[in-house]
Amino acid sequence: MRSRFSAFALGDAGYLLRSWHPTTRPAELTLDPDVRWYRLDIERTERGGPFDTDGVVEFVAHYKGAERGSLHEVSRFVRDGRDWFYVDAVTADRRA
């Protein structure tokens, strides 16, 4: 999860696509260059440990762009071997 936030902050769409599960991954991903992601708050996690094959992360990611705001998301991940992949999420946008 933290590596995906870092990829958003750095504008690394390639990493985001590579870490997205193939069953839900979009064909392409365009990031807004005017949005700056600057803080990640992990609210809770479920599973996702060294012996788990899936996990859930609830977080709030804060950004600045034309306006300041935050993205509140509950994301699902699955493990394939040593690697974790983002599957999907439920979001609730909030203004800061």
Language-model-detected regions and their locations in the chain:
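Tryptophan-centered motif/residue detector
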Residues: 20, 37-39, 84
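Surface-exposed, charged secondary-structure patches
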Residues: 32-70
